[in-house]
């Protein structure tokens, strides 16, 4: 599935964010709970993140051009970094509102109705996050994965808030409402930090996942048994695309056509194992001492 096809899932996230903003905002207005307010604020972050995801998926879907020969797939990492940053901002906002309420406790109202509305909003987020996570992992879209993680964080936030507000309702301990909001803020900081780390890794040309790299190495090792050699295997992940390159060493007496035919055969097998891979093969003669020495990943001019 191309990034253009993934955009409909970003629209799903936007629709879910709008629905939960209305529901959680209503729950907060009914109860006056700072915990539910923190939950509602995070839904605004969800909306901003979903809109950013849509924009970056649209950019990532653009074809390669003269200035972007490898396409625009890395645009997705800007979206996930933006989501991570927004999560951290939401955590700070929640903590600020909670600390203020801690020193100025307020009684809660219409708690039963407010909690019921919040539960409905949480179910919407849970279903949406499961859909986005499945699609994101299947098609290697860090944008959709980031959005799914964000929504799942929101679900756990809501669970904590609902439980806490319920306890306040039962016990009358007003201080518990802001304390729960502070704990929620501390919890979601971790998710935001993880998203920022993954985004930075992608922008720094991180290698493809270990299981895919192992599959490629297994294929190349099988061809070694047929008399071929390989070195300088390089991989990198760029959004939904994986880029793979290696040097294929063949007998020097082979014709270019014969070497090319073997190269095509190997590349086709790699694509069957890693369907989203873009592969570049460099042919070298086995007998050439320069070829034997040419194994450094960062070869410099002599």
Task: Describe the predicted segments one by one.
Residues 1-12, 67, 72-75, 187, ...:
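Peripheral (non-transmembrane) domains and long loops of multi-pass membrane proteins
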Residues 1-211:
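Alpha-helical transmembrane cores and adjacent cytosolic helix/loop segments
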């Amino acid at each position: 599935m191309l990034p253009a096809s993934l955009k409909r899932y970003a629209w799903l996230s936007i629709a879910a964010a709008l629905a939960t903003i209305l529901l959680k905002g209503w729950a907060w207005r009914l109860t006056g709970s700072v915990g539910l307010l923190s939950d509602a604020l995070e839904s605004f972050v969800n909306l901003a993140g979903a809109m950013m995801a849509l924009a970056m998926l649209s950019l990532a879907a653009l074809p390669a051009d003269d200035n972007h020969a490898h396409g625009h797939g890395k645009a997705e990492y800007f979206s996930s970094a933006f989501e991570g940053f927004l999560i951290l901002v939401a955590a700070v906002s929640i903590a600020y509102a909670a600390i203020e309420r801690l020193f100025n406790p307020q009684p809660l109202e219409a708690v039963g109705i407010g909690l019921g509305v919040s539960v409905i909003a949480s179910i919407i987020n849970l279903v949406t996050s499961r859909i986005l996570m499945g699609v994101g992992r299947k098609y290697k879209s860090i944008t959709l994965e980031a959005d799914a993680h964000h929504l799942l964080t929101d679900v756990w936030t809501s669970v904590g808030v609902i439980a806490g507000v319920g306890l306040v309702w039962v016990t009358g301990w007003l201080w518990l409402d802001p304390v729960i909001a502070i704990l929620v803020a501390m919890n979601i900081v971790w998710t935001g930090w993880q998203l920022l780390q993954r985004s930075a890794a992608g922008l720094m040309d991180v290698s493809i996942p270990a299981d895919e790299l192992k599959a490629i190495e297994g294929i190349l090792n099988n061809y070694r048994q047929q008399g071929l050699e390989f070195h300088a295997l390089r991989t990198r992940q760029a959004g939904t695309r994986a880029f793979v390159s290696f040097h294929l060493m063949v007998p020097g007496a082979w014709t270019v056509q014969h070497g090319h035919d073997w190269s095509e055969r190997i590349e086709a097998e790699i694509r069957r194992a890693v369907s989203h891979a873009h592969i570049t093969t460099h042919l070298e003669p086995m007998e050439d001492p320069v070829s034997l020495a040419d194994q450094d990943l960062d070869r410099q001019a002599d």
